[in-house]
Amino acid sequence: MSNKSDSFSTLPLPETSPRGMFRHFGPGLVLMMTGIGTSHLVTAPAAGGRFEFALLWCIPVAYVFKYYGFEMAFRFTNATGRSMLDAYSTAPRKWPVWYVLITTLIQCALGQAGRLAAAAAVLFYVFSEYLGLGLTNWAQGIGIDSLAVYGFGLGAISVAIVLYGRYAAVEMATKVLAGILFVSTVGVYLVEPAPFSAMGRFFTVEVPGGSWLIIAAFLGLLPTGMDVSLQASEWGKAKRVGMGRIREKLEEQGYVRPFDAFSSTKADLSVDVTKLPEHAQEYCRRWFRIGLMDFTLGHIVSFILATIFLLLAAVWLYPSPIEGRAVIGEIARIFTDSVGPGMMVVFIAGAFAATFSTAFNYFDGWPRVVAACCRNLFRSTADLPGIAADQLTPAHRSVMSSEYNIYRITMFYSLVAAVVILAGIPRPVYLVLVSSALAFFIAPVISFLNLYYCLTVIPKTDKAFYPSRFATLFSWLSLVIFTG
């Protein structure tokens, strides 16, 4: 046993100072940025512009009652070293995995069309309205909409970056772009904040006529879609830190049972942390604390931004329908009317940061989930797992059913399908609202499954990872509210 303990004694303990933790942030900030470019930059201004402060209550409802649905995914991955989809594969006939696969393929097309529409709308406004360059006039001459051209260009760039840099590119871009957006938006809000009396609308439920689509979009995509918790679980696993780093060694040394998606039960996912060497326990606990702080910080920042965008739109744009291809120019009035024309550049930088990073992250996230589903459904894919560059062999690249190739194929499918939809429906706000509302109907199932597997896989004696009584009860309450 001492030799086993010695094999874990060299694990580097991560810093837990604020500066040290921030260097390790990633999945939580990525999760936050998957919603900002649409729910914050488009849906929130549409709510404020059309209904003033009436829908402010939707924001705390979404953030408070969806919190543990996301948190359970982080908790499970940190407690077991496996992803939520590995847990889903232990259900009868793997029905949750099939459910996720089908809904994710739909989201790859319709959902990504909404994300690309928002990003394309920024470029359309900059080049066609603000600068008047008309770069896509050639496309209109042959019957192709300008938004589809910009969407294809942005999508192709995103796919190229993700395939070249893998997870590191996603993580680094997210940190930089999130900082640009947060600073510029808060700065503009401080120039002329909303009246204090409007804050009472946080606690007053009101459903104005014609607001149902925006409400569904808010609840579906604030802070982001619940299905993104599965992406975050895969991202967390991809970092290969904490339990995700040592799980394989634990299986080799007999601390935990090996997990096989085609023969194991959910009991084989469980890790009794109390039986691990003390250094390994501390290593896993620290990474869990960092992961929770990463997620919670992203959740709070996302809440602040969503609130500010709605309040700014209510103050500066109401009454306005907030629609059309030039929607970004209309939203830009928040910045130019409040501070001056010079703020246009700041807004464009923030808007592009939000919308592009959202589309960028989804080009990695949804294909990652589809590939993980196939890894848990098909033996040929499970025999060639992994998409990280250091995991790839010639077989990974040559065998079409490998997880890596399914990941790449899904990425290209998402790009083509999203651009086709965008070309057929060149209405950015409408596409954003519909794709966001779709996430609302998926959320309860994913939230339930995340909670169920945390409660039934993580040992109750594990005080560090097992959900507290409050977290459990509040999670059930949240499910009742979102399904009631």
PLM feature segments, named:
Residues 167, 173-176, 386-390, 396-410, ...:
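C-terminal membrane-solvent junction of multi-pass transporters and transport-like membrane proteins
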Residues 46-71, 94-97, 303:
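Extracellular loop-to-transmembrane helix junctions
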Residues 139-153, 342, 375-423:
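Loop-to-transmembrane helix boundary motifs in multi-pass membrane proteins
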